A protein has these predicted regions:
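Hinge/capping helix and adjacent helix->loop/strand transition within the periplasmic-binding protein
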Residues: 3-9, 22-108, 159, 170-203
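Conserved functional loop/turn residues at catalytic and ligand-binding sites
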Residues: 5, 58, 116-117, 136, ...
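Short, Asp-centered acidic motifs that coordinate Mg2+ and/or phosphate
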Residues: 8-12, 47, 119-120, 139
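Alpha-helix/helix-capping structural signal
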Residues: 17, 126-127, 199
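Structural motif detector for alpha-helix initiation sites
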Residues: 58-59, 154, 216
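Ligand-binding pocket segment of bilobal, Venus flytrap-like solute-binding proteins
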Residues: 72, 77-79, 83-154
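An extracytoplasmic/periplasmic, membrane-proximal ligand-sensing/linker region
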Residues: 92-94, 181-241
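C-terminal lobe and pocket-closing loops
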Residues: 127-196, 225-228
Length: 241
């Protein structure tokens, strides 16, 4: 998307992993390397999951257990990825410390937790849903301001008395940096109108996500805030290493 002609025919649809790749040094560009388009989808249904027989089933219970057993609880992550930053955010907010184990992708985390190789995993609810319905896993909750519109039965960390918020996956569009303003505006107008369509909104909900339109300016502001948080978390993690 950075190389093609800025004529509106090449567009990237991505999420905040774009920022993490830059913060961790995987890439030399961030959102600033693009013309930021509108934001359209939020997946805030990402949280921690444990086995049904774990000695904790809420965030307060987990925090108490971790403080009584510092460094003993194993957390499966993908080092340098979205879930890694999520875990570091939880540690910073609560003062606990996990024994981090790099187990790979979302599906790999489920396999590791099911096999008893880790104690907890951070993951999307949509990935863990089948294991929750079978009674194998328990969802501790989401680090969001409000309950998910898609999974309203899952509590937030906040309502459990834990002051922990962490942005979920924020999906939006990115255009080549030098895309003319009139093309950007035309694209934004078309997307904004599309996001008002009830069928489109329902299709997004059916995928386990929430339809959340933000203008390019508001999305860029959100990305700047998220990147600043990632930079702080990554710096703290490296300082402690």
């Amino acid at each position: 998307v950075q190389e093609p002609a800025p004529d509106g025919n090449t567009i990237l649809f991505f999420h905040n992993a774009l920022l993490i790749n830059n913060v961790t040094g995987v890439s030399d560009y961030s959102y600033e390397g693009f013309a930021v388009g509108p934001h359209v989808v939020t997946d805030n249904a990402t949280g921690f999951y444990v086995s049904a027989d774990a000695p904790y089933s809420t965030y307060p219970e987990l925090i108490d257990y971790c403080k009584e057993h510092p460094g003993e609880v194993t957390m499966g992550v993908e080092v340098g990825g979205f879930t890694y930053m999520m875990v570091k955010s939880f540690e910073a907010a609560t003062g606990v410390q996990f024994n981090l184990v790099d187990v790979g992708s979302h599906s790999d985390k489920c396999t590791a937790l099911l096999g008893g190789h880790i104690d907890i995993m951070p993951n999307q609810y949509s990935t863990a849903k089948g294991y929750i319905e079978s009674g194998d896993f328990v969802a501790l909750g989401f680090p969001a301001e409000e309950r998910s519109a898609v999974y309203p039965d899952v509590p937030t960390a906040k309502e459990q008395g834990v002051d922990w918020l962490y942005n979920g996956y924020e999906f939006g569009f990115f255009l080549p940096k030098d895309t003319p303003k009139d093309i950007q505006d035309t694209f934004d107008t078309a997307v904004a109108e599309l996001m008002e369509d009830e069928e489109v909104q329902q299709a997004i909900l059916d995928l386990g996500n929430e339809p959340t339109y933000l203008s390019p300016a508001d999305y860029e502001s959100q990305l700047a805030d998220i990147q600043a948080e990632y930079e702080e978390l990554w710096a703290a993690a490296n300082a402690a290493a």
